[in-house]
Regions:
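Short acidic-hydrophobic, aromatic-tinged amphipathic segments that line or gate anion-handling sites
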Residues: 52-58, 226-230, 279-293
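Short, well-ordered alpha-helix to beta-strand connector turns
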Residues: 71, 121-122, 143, 165, ...
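C-terminal alpha-helical cap of glycosyltransferases
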Residues: 307-327
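Active-site and donor-binding regions of nucleotide-sugar-utilizing enzymes
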Residues: 3-157, 173, 215, 249-251, ...
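Short active-site oxyanion
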Residues: 29-33, 120-125, 206-207, 239-241, ...
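Conserved catalytic-core segment of nucleotide-activated headgroup transferases in glycan assembly
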Residues: 13-21, 154-221
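Donor nucleotide-activated moiety binding/catalytic core segment of transferases
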Residues: 56-69, 210-256
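Catalytic binding pocket for nucleotide-activated donors in carbohydrate/polymer assembly enzymes
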Residues: 119-122, 248-310
Length: 327
């Protein structure tokens, strides 16, 4: 028995290719259950995948649940914002159940393992690739815990690249909720700069703004800007440009050959966006830079290297889970 625990939307996305493979396979795959919380609930409901919820006093509820289910392995997302993930790791350690979690995007490594001011690590951490591993170790995560697997969701979406759409996509992330003022900017300053630059180049009619499930749409009720709940991959299909901070939409946009930029006005910490940190897309901090960028043609020639790196991710995750379910 494997127990999957997901907190954020991207965590559910990471696991879904494996769940699909097992559901559609006639082979004797491991028995599994899913526990979902946070934004991942929306994802599993949309794909009609059943899951359990943990109610009541969280520590006692998790302890009771584990004593009933008795998994061999707990595989968790590492969202840094969902208490349930940490509680599962801590309770599993008490009763000797092996735990692993996975990195779904190249950012915020260390903060994923801090709970109430203390470091909390699973028995294993599944890294995306050697670059991810290197950055995690440099951030202070113990190398002995890390195993490179890949990113099954990104592998899947990179296999079929749709033609360019007609929109400029602005996906808003809940920066104020997750990071406060620590980055030097938030979703409001990101949006203000982006709107000014798009207006300068006369492309406001192409604009499409979406919000993360953790952002309250009522925040925009009295603002002169139209926003919609994000529809995930469909929003990127409909775009030719993705302007974000450090979101998954930017990674997919890059893989799909969209024009992508990381907009981080007043950034005062190490760049959390892998794409701009690695020099694959520009890091933009003012409206002049952004308006110049919006006048440039789409030119994304480096994406093949990232796509090639992702090949085999699902097979490696499947092999890992099969092995650990009988260990």
């Amino acid at each position: 028995m494997i127990l999957f625990v997901t907190g954020q939307y991207a965590g559910a996305q990471y696991l879904y290719p494996l769940i699909k493979r097992w559901k559609n396979s006639s082979e004797n795959n491991p028995e599994y259950k899913i526990v979902a919380t946070g934004a991942s609930i929306k994802y599993w409901k949309y794909h009609q995948i059943g899951f359990d919820s943990i109610d009541g006093k969280i520590n006692k509820s998790v302890e009771h649940y584990l004593n009933i289910v008795k998994p061999k392995l707990i595989l968790l997302s590492a969202s840094s914002t969902e208490e349930l993930e940490y509680i599962f790791i801590l309770q599993a350690k008490k009763i000797g159940i092996k735990t692993a979690n996975f990195i779904d995007i190249w950012t915020n490594y260390k903060s994923r393992y801090i709970y109430r001011g203390k470091e909390v690590y699973p028995d294993m951490i599944l890294s995306i690739n050697d670059k991810c591993t290197e950055e995690m170790v440099n951030a202070g995560i113990p190398a002995k815990l890390i195993k490179e697997i890949g990113q099954p969701y990104l592998e899947e979406v990179s296999q079929s690249i749709p033609p360019l759409g007609s929109k400029i996509l602005l996906p808003l992330q809940p920066i104020k909720k997750a990071k406060g003022c620590s980055l030097g900017y938030n979703e409001d300053s990101f949006l203000e700069l982006s709107l000014e630059a798009i207006n300068i180049v006369g492309k406001s009619e192409q604009l499409y703004i979406t919000v993360h499930p953790d952002i309250d749409l009522d925040m925009f009720k009295y603002k002169s800007v139209k926003v919609d709940l994000g529809r995930g991959i469909e929003d990127i299909k409909n775009s030719h440009t993705v302007l974000g901070m450090f979101s998954m939409q930017m990674i997919i946009g890059y893989l799909w050959g969209r024009r992508v930029a990381s907009i981080q006005p007043g950034l005062k910490v190490s760049d959390p966006s892998a794409l701009s940190r690695w020099g694959l897309v520009p890091l933009i901090e003012d409206k002049v830079q952004l308006s110049d960028f919006l006048k440039s043609p789409v030119n994304n020639v480096e994406r093949k290297e990232m796509i090639d790196m992702l090949i085999g991710s699902l097979d490696r995750l499947d092999e890992f889970c099969q092995k650990e379910s009988i260990a």
